[in-house]
């Protein structure tokens, strides 16, 4: 019973940590990453389709992304979807592909991204605390139903807190690591 609660807490906490790392990929660092375009969708035969499912998206160098659609008529659609996404660059259509040239980041942009990373970390910590609350509620219910003793419940609460501390530390480390990556010129 208790192991199920702990395993569920671990699984959910791991998902929160993975979600944080996925969120971090949307932040621009000194070196350009194609994940910055992951949230962009284009109209493809009436359906909103992720950009990477209708085109090849490559980082040609540290500051340029090249998007080559699999069907030429999509060039204009891709260009307007990127312009509408407001990612800080203007798309450049050369007739074959859409190129995005990212200027070097300013100190202010880097600091703004650090703020966003910290906010993402805080959101992940809130998620971890909610997971802890759910686990504690499950232990409390077992204790109330007399399925476990008061001593077992106390040990279970301690274990839930230990897991919470472990994942909170992992989140702090991830945020610190991302912060140093963002500030590196």
Curated annotation (Swiss-Prot):
InterPro entries, per the entry: Ribosome_recyc_fac, Ribosome_recyc_fac_dom, RRF_sf
GO cellular component: cytosol
Major localization class: cytoplasm
CDD domains assigned to the protein according to its UniProt record, in alphabetical order: RRF
SUPFAM superfamilies, A to Z: Ribosome recycling factor, RRF
Pfam families: RRF
Any one of the GO BP annotations: cytoplasmic translational termination
Entry's Gene Ontology molecular function annotations: ribosomal large subunit binding
Subcellular location: Cytoplasm
HAMAP family (alphabetical): RRF
Protein function: Responsible for the release of ribosomes from messenger RNA at the termination of protein biosynthesis. May increase the efficiency of translation by recycling ribosomes from one round of translation to another.
Protein name as annotated: Ribosome-recycling factor
Gene designation: frr
